[in-house]
Amino acid sequence: YHYLTGKNVADNQRLRFMTGDYYKLINEDNRRVTVGLNGMWWHYQKDLSGYTLGQGGYYSPQTYLSLAIPVNYRQRTDNWSWELGGSVSVSHSATSSRARYPLQNLLNNSIQPIPDRYEPDDGGSSNGVGYTLRALIERRLSSHWTLGAGVDIQQAKDYTPSHALIYLRYSMAGWQGSLDMPPQPLVPYSDFK
């Protein structure tokens, strides 16, 4: 549960529930194959996805449901580690009609009348299918240096946050043991938690 607040934006409440499980088809020290099933449910008290004064401009459906089936293959050797994976998902979302200007006190009619001040924005529902593809690879160059690369392709209607990266990591202590499986790439600042 989260209570969302902001300046000149209507307050909102959200509930989110996520669950999932996976099965290891192959579970060896240096190789692993998994398949899973993930589910998500979101509920927002208000749809504040609009961009008028008082709206939040963020995705906030009253109902969002999704199911995904992820598959991953991971392997490592003495100086290499890689992962290939992907998933396919289906989703459903629904929103109610909403006030175009949820905070009427922010509007001042004495400056300029707003003809659509009390007009609602219609809600609706939609269904979608999406997929992700991911590939990561790392190569140990020496005890201290590791070179890595990755690509993450995400595709869904109106949402495609794909990215690729190449990185060079330096370990001050040095390491000749097993590489991480899966590889641990640098995390984009936008994904940092």
Residue ranges of predicted features:
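Outer-membrane beta-barrel translocator domains and adjoining extracellular loop/strand segments
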Residues: V9-R16, Q45-G54, T95-L103, T160-L165, ...
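Outer-membrane beta-barrel "beta-signal"
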Residues: T160-K193
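Extracellular loop and loop/strand-boundary signature of outer-membrane beta-barrel proteins
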Residues: Y3-V9, M18-Y22, T52-S60, Y118-G123, ...
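Residues that define the transmembrane beta-barrel architecture of outer-membrane proteins
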Residues: D11-F17, D29-R31, P61-L67, D78, ...
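Repeated loop/turn-to-beta-strand initiation elements of outer-membrane beta-barrel proteins
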Residues: N27-V33, N79-W82, L141-A149, G174-L179
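Residues on the lipid-exposed face of transmembrane beta-strands in outer-membrane beta-barrel proteins
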Residues: F17-Y23, G39, I69-Q75, G86-V88, ...
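Transmembrane beta-strands of outer-membrane beta-barrel pores
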Residues: Y1-K7, Y23-L25, G39-Q45, T63-L65, ...
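Outer-membrane beta-barrel translocator/channel fold
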Residues: Y1-N12, N30-S66, V187-K193
